[in-house]
Swiss-Prot record:
Function: Multivalent scaffold protein that anchors the cAMP-dependent protein kinase/PKA to cytoskeletal and/or organelle-associated proteins, targeting the signal carried by cAMP to specific intracellular effectors. Association with the beta2-adrenergic receptor (beta2-AR) not only regulates beta2-AR signaling pathway, but also the activation by PKA by switching off the beta2-AR signaling cascade.
Cellular localization per UniProt: Postsynaptic recycling endosome membrane; Cell projection, Dendrite; Postsynaptic cell membrane
Subunit structure: Binding protein for dimer of the RII-beta regulatory subunit of cAMP-dependent protein kinase (PKA) and also for the protein kinase C (PKC) and the phosphatase calcineurin (PP2B). Each enzyme is inhibited when bound to the anchoring protein. Also binds the beta2-adrenergic receptor. Part of a complex containing AKAP5, ADCY5, ADCY6 and PDE4C. Interacts with ADCY8, and enhances its phosphorylation at lipid rafts. Interacts with ORAI1 (isoform alpha) (via N-terminus) upon store depletion and in response to LTC4. Does not interact with ORAI2 and ORAI3 paralogs.
Domain comment (free text): RII-alpha binding site, predicted to form an amphipathic helix, could participate in protein-protein interactions with a complementary surface on the R-subunit dimer.
The protein's name: A-kinase anchor protein 5
Superkingdom per UniProt: Eukaryota
Modified residues (Phosphoserine): S4, S22
Annotated region described as Essential to the intracellular anchoring function, given as residue ranges: 1-164
UniProt PTM comment: Palmitoylated. Palmitoylation at Cys-36 and Cys-123 play a key role in the targeting of AKAP5 to lipid rafts. Palmitoylation by ZDHHC2 is required for AKAP5 function in LTP-stimulated recycling endosome exocytosis.
Record region (28 X 8 AA repeats of V-G-Q-A-E-E-A-T): 304-628
Region annotation (Tethers NFATC2 to CRAC channels) ranges: 728-745
Length: 745
């Protein structure tokens, strides 16, 4: 058998009726009968559709042409295009000749088989649709029509099957031309109705029975085919002649093995026999057409049956399965071998060479897809495992951090209790009071404030302050206060207020540990504070400060200031300012000043008040301003007579920004100040301003007096601002009235 070059064309033409007829008839009868019958009956109807019907006719004749000789892939393309044009001319000749050799009138060189004459009878329906435009075309390229029939067969298979199966089937179709031809006939008939216009790209598949390999070539549109048809006709004829000789020995075996033995072998022999005589019988195509016309009409009516459908279905399945098995293992080798053999013969054109390269790439890509799918699966599995491991690690780390944080909180609470007990025991000793007061206060207050600012401060400060103050203040108030205030308040309070509680506590602990810190307190304070300062302050301060800042600060500051004002102010004011700067500082400063002046500042009022006032002025002034601004309407009513109603003023009131600079009272000149209330000036004159000048530390002033001074100053500023705003409003109202009057005038 000659290797047939089949091309898959996507065309839209009306061959649905013949499609039903051809699959039912045998493949041989299908190719010839459907083509012939359609051409004759549908010649007038399907002239615009002749391209697709000619493709079907060529598909039917392809088994004959395939048996007679192989065509180059480029030749197949060109031949198909040429057939489309020649079919219109020579389709009637093909219809008559297919029983002998359908395509004889067009290309005498191309073998036209009598076996196709049988096929032409069922193909009469197809020929009806194709007669219009294909009769004239088929006369010139009957051999090419056969090639196209095989190409159409491959088209249907490629469309019905996945691309992979189509490629594999194409590789073994050289061995299975008989089966493929039958399958192609069915597929051609069924596929042409659903096919796309002939202008689309076509895939040409060359089948070589001798090499048992197939090359899938991607072809250009029919324009290239038409140009190449004329040049390739002689080469195709010579190829078919050579293939017929060689295929006589080797092809029958492959055909019988690939396709059902009885239909495939009989069809192949029938194709081989007429192929040699097609050239000779080309001139007698007209007589054959006339004879076959009557036969096709009769056979077209009776040949349609269910037997062909079953046979074709089985043949297609077998052909596809065998093609898949044959090409599954070595699709690339078959393609390469065929390409090389054709290149040696000089039959491949440039377009064909490119299509061979593309076919190789497609085969390689498909072969790689299986490997890639497995590699992807392995990679995905590994990625998932790594992700799961990473997620588990992160989860475990988070869980551990949470657990550690909770454990540290509990540890700090227990450590605070242990420290309190140790502090109480240590403070009982009279000689250790100086060092113990500083150490116990710092360790106890620092840890208690950090761990549980709300509850721990109440318990810890109450117990520690009661024990420490009771025993320590009587014995060592003078020494402890002097040493503590000089050594701790200035550096520690300054750092605590300016920086953060963490730095203040580190500095305080560093100094206290130098004196005499017990081993338990050292380990507990060092580890507990370092480990839990970040976590406990965030959690505890947020919750505890909001709920119990007022009560905790009152109790803590009130008792802590008795013994060590510096430590209480460091821990309390530092944390209070960080947690709730607005409310906590207000409460802390108020209570700190009251407790400091009332209980503990008898010995060190000068130094303590200097630091306290400097630190307390900022929050106190801000709070005073807020309080005064909230009571601004009352101030308006009491001290200011407004010329306009309040409703109008409130509507037009613009925001007033009051800025109070931080200045030490020693630098504050009451006489030069314009905004100081008169009452304050009178009181200052009575008390003699020299009191401030005599002592830079303001020992004669209490915190209450400083607070009242700040409040009065702020209130005076607010009053002045309100007066100015009222004046502006009045001026604006007057100007508006004047403008209105001018408009009326």
């Amino acid at each position: 058998m000659e290797t047939s070059v089949s091309e898959i064309q996507v065309e839209t033409k009306d061959e649905k009726g013949p499609v039903a007829a051809s699959p039912q008839k045998e493949r041989q009868e299908r190719k010839t009968a459907t083509l012939c019958f359609k051409r004759r009956k549908k010649a007038n109807k399907t002239k615009p559709k002749a391209g697709s019907r000619t493709a079907e006719e060529t598909k039917k004749h392809t088994p004959e042409a395939g048996g007679s000789g192989q065509r180059q892939p480029a030749g197949a393309w060109a031949s198909i295009k040429g057939l489309v044009t020649h079919r219109k001319r020579s389709e009637p000749a093909k219809k008559q000749k297919p029983p002998e050799a359908e395509v004889q009138p067009e290309d005498g060189a191309l073998p036209k088989k009598k076996a196709k004459s049988r096929l032409k009878f069922p193909c009469l329906r197809f020929s009806r649709g194709a007669k219009r435009s294909r009769h004239s075309k088929l006369t010139e390229d009957s051999g090419y029509v056969r090639v196209q029939g095989e190409a159409d067969d491959l088209e249907i298979k490629a469309q019905t099957q996945p691309d992979d199966q189509a490629i594999q089937a194409g590789s073994t179709q050289g061995l299975q031309e008989g089966v493929l031809v039958r399958d192609g006939k069915k597929s051609q008939e069924s596929h042409i109705s659903n096919s796309v216009t002939s202008g689309e790209n076509v895939i040409a598949i060359e089948l070589e029975l001798e090499n048992k390999s197939s090359a899938i070539q991607m072809g250009t549109p029919e324009l290239e085919k038409e140009t190449k048809v004329i040049t390739e006709k002689p080469s195709v004829q010579t190829q078919r002649a050579s293939l017929l000789e060689s295929s006589a020995a080797g092809s029958p075996r492959s055909v019988t093995s690939a396709a059902p033995p009885s239909p495939a072998t009989t069809h192949q022999h029938s194709l081989e026999e007429p192929s040699n005589g097609i050239r000779e019988s080309a001139p007698s195509g007209k007589d054959d057409r006339r004879k076959t016309a009557a036969e096709e009409k009769k056979s077209g009516e009776t040949a349609l049956g269910q037997a062909e459908e079953a046979a074709v279905g089985q043949a297609d399945k077998r052909a596809l399965s065998q093609a898949g098995e044959a090409t599954a293992g070595h699709p690339e080798e078959a393609t390469v071998i065929q390409a090389e053999s054709q290149a040696k013969e000089g039959k491949l054109s440039q377009a064909e060479e490119t299509t061979v390269a593309q076919a190789k790439e497609t085969v390689l890509s498909q072969a790689k897809e299986g490997e890639l799918s497995q590699a992807k699966k392995a990679t995905v599995g590994q990625a998932e495992e790594a992700t799961i491991d990473h997620t588990e690690k992160v989860t475990v780390d988070q869980a551990e951090e949470t657990t550690v944080g909770q454990a540290e909180e509990a540890t700090v609470g227990q450590a605070g209790e242990a420290i309190l007990s140790q502090a109480k025991e240590a403070t009982v000793v009279g000689q250790a009071e100086e060092a113990t007061v500083d150490r116990a206060e710092e360790a106890t207050v620092g840890q208690a404030e950090e761990a549980t600012v709300g509850h721990t401060e109440k318990v810890t400060v109450d117990q520690a302050e009661e024990a420490t103050v009771g025993q320590a203040e009587e014995a060592t108030v003078g020494q402890a206060e002097e040493a503590t205030v000089d050594w701790a308040e200035k550096p520690t309070v300054g750092q605590a207020e300016e920086a953060t509680v963490g730095q203040a506590e580190e500095a305080t602990v560093g100094h206290t540990e130098k004196v005499t810190v017990d081993q338990a307190e050292e380990a507990t304070v060092g580890q507990a504070e370092e480990a839990t300062v970040g976590h406990t302050e965030k959690v505890t301060v947020d919750h505890a400060e909001e709920a119990t800042v007022g009560q905790a600060e009152e109790a803590t500051v009130g008792q802590a200031e008795k013994v060590t004002v510096d430590h209480a102010e460091e821990a309390t004011v530092g944390q209070a300012e960080e947690a709730t700067v607005g409310q906590a500082e207000k409460v802390t400063v108020d209570h700190a000043e009251e407790a400091t002046v009332g209980q503990a500042e008898e010995a060190t009022v000068g130094q303590a008040e200097k630091v306290t006032v400097d630190q307390a002025e900022e929050p106190t002034v801000d709070q005073a301003e807020e309080a005064i601004s909230s009571h601004a309407p009352d101030l308006k009513e009491n001290g200011i007579d407004t010329e306009k109603p309040r409703s109008e003023e409130s509507k037009r009131m613009e925001p007033i920004a009051i800025i109070i600079t931080d200045t030490e009272i020693s630098e504050f000149d009451v006489k030069k100040s314009k905004n100081v209330p008169k009452q304050f000036l009178i009181s200052m004159e009575n008390e003699q301003v020299g009191v401030f000048a005599n002592d830079s530390d303001f020992e004669g002033r209490t915190s209450e007096q400083y607070e009242t001074l700040l409040i009065e100053t702020a209130s005076s500023l607010v009053k002045n601002a309100i007066e100015l705003s009222v004046e502006q409003l009045v001026n604006e109202m007057v100007s508006e009235d004047n403008q209105i009057n001018t408009l009326f005038q």
